[in-house]
From Swiss-Prot:
Organism: Rickettsia massiliae (strain Mtu5)
InterPro entries for this protein: Rossmann-like_a/b/a_fold, RPE1, TilS/TtcA_N, tRNA_Ile_lys_synt, tRNA_Ile_lys_synt_N
GO biological process: one example: tRNA modification
Protein name: tRNA(Ile)-lysidine synthase
Function: Ligates lysine onto the cytidine present at position 34 of the AUA codon-specific tRNA(Ile) that contains the anticodon CAU, in an ATP-dependent manner. Cytidine is converted to lysidine, thus changing the amino acid specificity of the tRNA from methionine to isoleucine.
EC identifiers of the protein: 6.3.4.19
Coiled coil: none
Location of the protein in the cell: Cytoplasm
């Protein structure tokens, strides 16, 4: 039965955490509505408080009805329901990705407020199959092709207990229990490659790997020769190690069953070999400093596999830049080639400066490119540049957090003790200093907490390096 499969999954994924409450994301579609009813049975059985969260993206008229419907279901189940709203600000560029990030920001922030550690989502078997096909078409490496049933976002654990349950079983469950759901009309549009794949697989047809239209291969602009070279230069090493991808997967057609088999093999290789290697590589070769820069030991780095090397570079770029997305492989590959040439260099990538200093790679935030916005310190704490948490320990009126300008630096230069930063950053202290948070009142710099600069003994601020790092493979609180 469906519930027994769900119960087995969720108990295995959550483990013995002794949770007293849990949250669930529900949109109104068949997948999440089925998840809500299954999770409700499980929560009731285990005496766990269930919080239902819906996000209205304000893009479809139907969304208001969906939210109202979920609220009614939640009330009937005696579960608390929270309706959140995503503001797209009439900016429709890259909307799907921004809406997804906005949705997870809203839901996980609410979880933090409610002291909830786990969020359930309704990703099912068909979603995993579609993702595998899409990533295959983008020539993803082994890490990109893998999937995970547990992810982290904003220090909230995202759990997918429907991972091995096809959509058809969820629909059958709803129909048999006379439960209605809403269909998103955009799911039937041929505008999105995902929908084309979904419709073919739903009819029992084989998946044919798409290879020609550049619209679906944006990162390579339709350049088949270039994309194939990039794919084999790094990804092939790990793929061949476990004979992960069959010839059909690389160049031909696959049935849904074959795709699931390939996905399981990929996940097994990641879990048993590459993920432990990645964690070891970060522990052995990476040093991250509270000033928001990092060093990579290239001697230790050299012993790891190419796929892991790509992940480490991207890990550092995300951490140091404060961005939420990884750099494309074809952007990282030139850096890897430069490293093998054993010469010092200085490059920019992903909002970072990458500088080789003998056997180490220094990575720090690029100053002058997309400078972070100033943040008013209204509350006790504020996150600035998606990297630093600044906390005030006293009432400080009209102060705000920003970066140090060259003009400000000239005014206070003689009062700054930069020797510790100079030593840690191998004499790159001036560049790093310009990327650190400072506190100002009007036009006056009153504090640079990282270097213990205060213009008055009454000020006291704490600062910590706390980037919102998101990864399917590693998590560090």
């Amino acid at each position: 039965m469906l519930y027994e499969k769900f119960e087995y999954n969720i108990n295995n994924l959550i483990g013995n955490f002794g949770l007293s409450k849990i949250s669930i994301a529900v949109s109104g579609g068949s997948d999440s509505v089925a998840l809500l009813y299954l999770a409700n049975i499980w929560a009731e059985k285990n005496n766990i408080e269930l919080f239902v969260i819906s996000v209205d993206h304000n893009l479809r008229e139907q969304s208001k009805q969906e939210t109202h419907y979920i609220q009614n279901i939640s009330n009937s189940l005696n579960r608390k329901h929270y309706s959140l709203s995503f503001d797209h600000q009439n900016n429709f560029s890259n909307l799907q990705e921004r809406a997804r990030e906005g949705r997870y920001d809203l839901m996980t922030n609410l979880c933090l407020e409610l002291d909830i550690l786990v969020l359930l989502t309704a990703h099912h078997e068909d979603d995993y199959v579609e993702n595998f096909c899409l990533r295959l078409e983008r020539n993803s490496g082994i890490f990109g092709l893998s999937s995970s049933n547990i992810n982290w976002y904003n220090n909230i654990q995202i759990i997918r207990p429907l991972y091995n349950i096809p959509k058809s079983e969820l629909v059958e469950y709803l129909v048999s229990h006379n439960i209605k759901w809403f269909e998103d009309e955009s799911n039937s549009s041929d505008k999105y490659r995902r929908n084309v794949i979904r419709q073919k697989l739903a009819k029992g047809a084989d998946y044919i790997r798409h290879r020609s239209k550049p619209a679906y291969r944006e990162e390579f602009k339709g350049d088949t020769e270039r994309s194939t070279a990039a794919y084999t230069s790094v990804g092939e090493e790990a793929l061949l190690r476990g004979s992960i991808l069959s010839l059909e997967a690389k160049f031909g057609t696959m049935s849904k069953a074959a795709i699931i088999s390939q996905q399981l093999k990929t996940n097994k290789l990641i879990e048993n070999e590459l993920k432990p290697e990645l964690i070891s590589a970060i522990a052995e070769a990476v040093k991250i400093f509270e000033y928001g820069f990092a060093f990579l030991d290239l001697v230790k780095f050299d012993k790891f596999s190419n796929e892991v090397k790509v992940q480490i570079i991207n890990f550092l770029l995300i951490i140091i830049s404060g961005q939420s997305r990884a750099a494309r492989f074809y952007s990282v590959e030139p850096i890897l080639k430069l490293i093998t040439q054993d010469v010092n260099f200085k490059n920019t990538l992903h909002g970072c400066i990458i500088k080789r200093i003998q056997n180490e790679l220094l990575i720090y935030r690029e100053f002058g490119k997309k400078l972070p916005e100033s943040k008013i310190l209204l509350d006790k704490s504020v996150i600035w540049d998606n990297r630093f948490c600044i906390t005030k320990n006293q009432e400080t009126p009209n102060c705000f957090v920003t970066h140090l300008s060259l003009e400000d630096y000239k005014i206070i230069k003689k009062q700054l003790d930069l020797e510790p930063l100079k030593n840690l950053s191998c004499k790159n202290h001036n560049a790093v200093l310009l990327t650190l948070p400072i506190i100002k009142i009007l036009e006056k710099v009153i504090a640079i907490p990282h270097i213990s600069y205060y213009d008055n003994d009454m000020w006291n601020f704490e600062v910590s390096f706390a980037p919102n790092f998101v990864s399917r493979f590693t998590h560090f609180c």
